[in-house]
């Protein structure tokens, strides 16, 4: 059985400002750096052997802090990027028009075909983050990988691991630098989560 640890990046400036990030980026706050240091301490205790991270800046920085403590290299994987929020990226959530808020709600509240213009669907997100998780099966026996990703991306991944639809992530709300664990059986196509 392979244990895969899932970590959301530390708090960013835009998290604090309630801005939509998606695949756009903002730096970690001092609090976010501290959160990553706390995860790094725990990751070292867990014996993490591989760190696989989204290639966006906020996850890169979180992964760098963890890798330094664990003595691991980082593998960057664009499949772990956040949901592409299209034309709403970089916007303050409180400044959305009624139409824009409806797009956002349709997407995150479970409309199967929900999509923000120029963005991606929850199913597209689910397909790519699940493929990234599956690639952990190719790591050497005894590996303890840690994936560093984003709130909606990880929520979507955990939802599908639990057998829920991709858009059920809304009910899971993973906090900045939270740690979740997925147990993946190497022989059967079966994944279980212990959250």
Regions from the language model: what does each represent?
Residues 60, 130-183:
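Active-site-adjacent alpha-helix immediately C-terminal to a catalytic or transition-state-stabilizing loop
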Residues 184-191:
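Conserved small/polar residues in nucleotide/adenosyl-binding loops
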Residues 38-104:
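Phosphate-coordination/substrate-recognition cap region in phosphate-metabolizing enzymes
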Residues 19, 102-116:
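Short, basic/glycine-rich phosphate-binding loops at helix/coil junctions
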Residues 1-5:
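Extreme N-terminal starter segment of soluble prokaryotic enzymes
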């Amino acid at each position: 059985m392979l244990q895969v640890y899932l970590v959301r990046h530390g708090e960013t400036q835009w998290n604090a400002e309630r801005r939509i990030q998606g695949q756009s980026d903002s730096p970690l706050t001092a609090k976010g750096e501290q959160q990553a240091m706390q995860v790094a301490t725990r990751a070292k205790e867990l014996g993490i052997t591989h760190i696989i991270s989204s290639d966006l800046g906020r996850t890169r920085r979180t992964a760098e802090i963890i890798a330094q403590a664990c003595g691991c290299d980082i593998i960057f994987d664009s499949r772990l990027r956040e949901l592409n929020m299209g034309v709403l990226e970089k916007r303050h959530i409180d400044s959305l028009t009624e139409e824009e808020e409806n797009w956002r709600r349709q997407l995150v509240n479970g409309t199967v075909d929900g999509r923000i213009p120029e963005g991606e669907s929850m199913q597209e997100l689910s397909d790519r983050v699940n493929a990234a998780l599956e690639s952990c099966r190719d790591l050497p026996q005894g590996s303890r990988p840690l994936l560093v990703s984003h709130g909606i991306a990880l929520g979507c991944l955990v939802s599908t691991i639990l057998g829920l639809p991709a858009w059920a992530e809304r009910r899971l709300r993973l906090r900045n630098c939270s740690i979740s664990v997925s147990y993946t059986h190497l022989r059967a196509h079966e994944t279980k989560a212990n959250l």
